């Protein structure tokens, strides 16, 4: 079925998604004020973790083998982590795509990963954690076989959890509302649920060692902790924050206790023996920056489009995480589908009943597919048109609409616009958070109103020490170009 391109240019159609450095800088200024206010007042954002900044950067080198689990929005990972202490330059140069410099102080063993199915997300908490316990037991059993007699009777366990929680101590936490498709209620004891789940698989016998929970942290907190361990601070460099952009989007940064509302200051903070807990002590804070408290700047600066509103209205918890709907892997594919469908039916006047079924099904287009679209990213099929014909196949009936090169290029423009906006917004949030934590300072000059996208606008660092954020690169796989664009926006905005 032939199509005729509407005279309306795609750049005009996609104008609501357009951003430039001036708009991103304005967002950074506004988010900085919002973050400062949320730290001082919100009970569901800027959640404290009882870990001081000094503990993040100890003078000594930890060593040993530990059990670790990562409960994410999409996958569960379980494995043993070996801390190697002082880097060994003779260690093998590559593994899992990482360089020696990136992994020289940590080695992973017997790691396994399982997808968290939609059915599990809708089950009772006890069912979900019984399944998690079974997976843990499987890896522990493998450890017993790999190192017979070497594992202790009680294995220390560290837990990374990709959801909001109230942290009472380093090893005790209460779940808040989970989001990301999970229907589990809040106010549940995470450690208790996990131990009970493992004991069900252990069967109360001595065949498998017991586990002891020694640390529970949010995944963004864990990112910062692991980065601080991997890359020791120097007079010219330190780990400043942890950033997650995957199924969800979140960050962690050390903040002074004085910036937090008194009710959010932990009763006991883990500090070095030489320290006391003063108001100027910084602790790791899980920002949960995508929750509704940060929606104000997005609305005031017209970042939220009609497509975003439709996506949010059809989501699991409308209005709960507006920033996440615009930046995270769980939602960007669906956002693209909504935009593509509108253009085809409204601008090109194509009957939706003749379109590929995946375009009319909710979540029919994945973020992974949309992110890999394009000749510069495709490894197996350089033709943009053939990528779409294969990934979003047309109906087989005669008279059904077919992809054309012109429409394929439009879809690529949509994917790119979504990616660029997500990268710019995340960069603005990163800069805003660094400023909120006094790691950098905004210049006194007002934000420019008509700067081009390549014009640089610099902020002043709080000291002459270079700050670094740790990014889970593997989480960028759904949108391979996002990391590069995020880095470029940060460099343009921050002047790195």
Residue ranges and their predicted role:
Residues 113-133, 165-233, 239-241, 259, ...:
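Glycine-rich phosphate-binding loop and adjoining helix at the ATP-binding site
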Residues 79-81, 90-91, 169-172, 254-256:
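Short, solvent-exposed loop/turn and secondary-structure capping segments
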Residues 41, 102-110, 207-212, 287-307:
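Acidic/polar, low-complexity linker and loop regions
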Residues 82-84, 159-165:
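Short glycine-enriched loops at secondary-structure junctions
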Residues 61-62, 69-77, 162, 220-221, ...:
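A short acidic Gly-Thr/Ser loop motif
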Residues 1-109, 120-153, 230, 304-496:
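ATP-binding/phosphotransfer module of carbohydrate and carboxylate kinases, centering on a glycine-rich
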Residues 87-93, 180-187, 225-337, 341:
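Glycine-rich phosphate-binding loop of actin/hexokinase-like ATP-binding domains
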